[in-house]
From Swiss-Prot:
One of its GO terms (biological process) is intracellular manganese ion homeostasis. Central regulator of manganese homeostasis. NCBIfam families: PRK03902.1. This is HTH-type transcriptional regulator MntR. Coiled coil: none annotated. Keywords: Activator, Cytoplasm, DNA-binding, Manganese, Metal-binding, Repressor, Transcription, Transcription regulation. Residues 1-63 form the HTH dtxR-type domain. DNA binding is strongly activated by Mn(2+). Mn(2+) 2 binds at residues 11, 77, 99, 102.
Amino acid sequence: MTTPSMEDYIEQIYMLIEEKGYARVSDIAEALAVHPSSVTKMVQKLDKDEYLIYEKYRGLVLTPKGKKIGKRLVYRHELLEQFLRIIGVDEEKIYDDVEGIEHHLSWNSIDRIGDLVQYFEDDSKRIDDLRSVQKRNEQENQ
């Protein structure tokens, strides 16, 4: 079972490896705005829990278990960003909102949000209809 903090690290490590081909402690620390010693401590825990293999001074690699979870965490994050965009959340608020909610939703809720995103994306008229409702509500609330 992963904690929200473990998920943040696994997600960031997965993204760094996808982007650069590797993830160093210093890269992870910079991306998460934490001290390198905190990264080392968490990486050792993730190694112990078999999410990654860490060798001091040699770097780290995700295990198949770590890759699977990392991929799912990135999917969750991107899906929630899509969802908030569809429902009209201001772009500059989306990242922080996703960070605030992503660890508090069950995977069942994430799957249902995925269904809703697909529903809207399957027919752009649905998004237009939503925008009309939002516009009408804004006018009524003024």
